[in-house]
Amino acid sequence: MANETLKAGFDKYMAGVEAKLAKNPERANLEPNRLYTPLDIEGFDYEKDLGFPGEYPYTRGVQPTMYRGRFWTMRMYAGFSTAEESNKRYRYLLANGGSGLSCAFDLPTQIGYDSTDPMAEGEVGKVGVAIDSLADMEILFDQISLDQVSTSMTINAPASVLLCMYIAVAEKQGVSADKLRGTIQNDILKEYAARGTYIFPPKPSMRLITNIFEYCSKNVPLWNTISISGYHIREAGSTASQEIAFTIADGIAYVEAAIKAGMNVDDFAGRLSFFWNCLL
């Protein structure tokens, strides 16, 4: 009876505001309810549909206490010029409140060109730091203890190379790979679709990515092996709905490729991360 009364009141309310609502049409290609009431959750199962914090279906967060228990990492996207200059910037950021690093690489590094290659002329060190060798990587993280900081590297086609360099630098510091924390973007499918810093065709690129999944699951277990990215897709002109759809489709493709390569989904899925624009 209470719901019948509520429905009658709701219908009366909506009839009175339809004219005003018509002046502001939705732009997200969706038709959400204009007002939500208990009528919308009839048959709602608390444990199945909402759940508890930190438990499936994760509608209330992936951790029981979320940022109240562990604050999110503060990292500023940075990298420019030479490894020496970027190292100074990283150490400055860590000394002034940063709790992690986010590495930007120049375009030649992103597409596998050495800084001395004629194709790299005019682009070296312009939108990120130039990394040509392990020596550059050692300079980039000089005086930074890699077991004390997590590092995000925005690198895709040559992600396996930069990750290997990072592990090698850590070993020279006396830090074992299983202590390293961080993320590589490693999302080549969105490069084909929206951004363009790819090197190899899709099939061998996917093999490199699944190889990274497998290697890290065994040797670098705290490392996020991919950041499946919708942000770039949205910036390239998609709607919010398209961004979600294409990014989830990319994620499914990565999971299917890894399973096809013989991996157990539980061995790698926990280290798949996402990077969205549509939440902003």
What does each of the following model-derived ranges do?
Residues 1-279:
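Catalytic alpha/beta active-site cores
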